[in-house]
């Protein structure tokens, strides 16, 4: 199997959210797509172990925010690499409550939808929820939607382990070893973000050419917020 072929499939990046009672949930999704035009229906694939999956089953509703190409990586890390069971992902995040009672995130987003679940299917490790769009809106009419390819190539992020598109990092490393041998690359062991000295970290104001060892002691991963001790040299 050539695992590089999986990265040729195009995806967007979204924050899928829901609420059941007083419990809110949300996660980063790239497997989300429109399946019918009339009525407008969308499918999402959610890991069975995700806290949000339980809340969607309870509430029967979900919403999603279409992330901007200029999305704050910390927001992606917040919803993508932490569990809502023991962490309030919505603290400090701008959102509003939609018609169906779904918390809709507006930060770093260009548009949003709110859906009522019509069907669901169990597919191995994941559940596919199909929901009819009940309401939607634009947040940034001129903003560009964030693609997974941009997230991976520019922001150096990877799918978390529970994502349906997750590929074991050892298989990815086999593809990228040649490039890594030519540059200083340090990888976050939590989210697999890669710090490349030749590029620096423009998000945190780190200039290109800055060695990882010369980074400030308070520097953290721009994706998941892990400190320097969580990085290993590739």
What do these predicted ranges mean?
Residues 182-184, 217-218:
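Short metal-coordination and nucleic-acid-contact micro-motifs, chiefly zinc-binding Cys/His arrays
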Residues 197-198, 229-233:
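Short, non-ligating residues that shape and space the ligands of small metal-coordination modules
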Residues 188-191, 221-224:
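Short cysteine-rich clusters marking metal-coordination/redox-active sites
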Residues 158-173, 189-207:
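Short, charged low-complexity linear segments at domain edges
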Residues 1-181:
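Basic, polyanion-binding surface patches
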Residues 17, 196, 216:
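Residue-level detector of conserved, well-ordered beta-strand and adjacent loop positions
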Residues 213, 223-229:
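Cys/His-rich finger/ribbon microdomains and the adjacent scaffold used
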């Amino acid at each position: 199997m050539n695992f590089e072929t999986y990265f040729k499939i195009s995806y967007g990046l979204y924050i899928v959210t829901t609420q059941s009672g007083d419990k809110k949930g949300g996660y980063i999704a790239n497997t989300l797509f429109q399946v019918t035009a009339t009525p407008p229906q969308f499918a999402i694939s959610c890991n069975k172990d995700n806290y949000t999956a339980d809340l969607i089953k309870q509430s029967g509703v979900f919403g999603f925010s279409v992330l901007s190409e200029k999305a704050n990586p910390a927001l992606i890390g917040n919803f993508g690499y932490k569990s809502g069971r023991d962490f309030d992902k919505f603290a400090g995040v701008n959102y509003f409550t939609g018609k169906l009672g779904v918390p809709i995130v507006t930060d770093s987003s260009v548009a949003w939808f709110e859906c009522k679940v019509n069907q669901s299917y169990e597919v191995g490790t994941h559940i596919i929820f199909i929901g009819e769009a009940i309401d939607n809106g634009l947040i940034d009419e001129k903003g560009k939607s964030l693609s997974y390819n941009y997230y991976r190539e520019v922001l150096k992020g990877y799918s978390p382990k529970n994502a349906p598109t997750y590929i074991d990092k050892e298989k990815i490393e086999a593809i990228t070893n040649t490039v890594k041998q030519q540059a200083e690359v340090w990888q976050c062991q939590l989210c697999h973000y890669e710090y490349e000295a030749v590029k620096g970290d423009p998000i945190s104001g780190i200039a290109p050419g800055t060695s990882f060892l010369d980074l400030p002691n308070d520097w953290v991963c721009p994706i998941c917020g892990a400190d320097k001790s969580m990085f290993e040299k590739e």
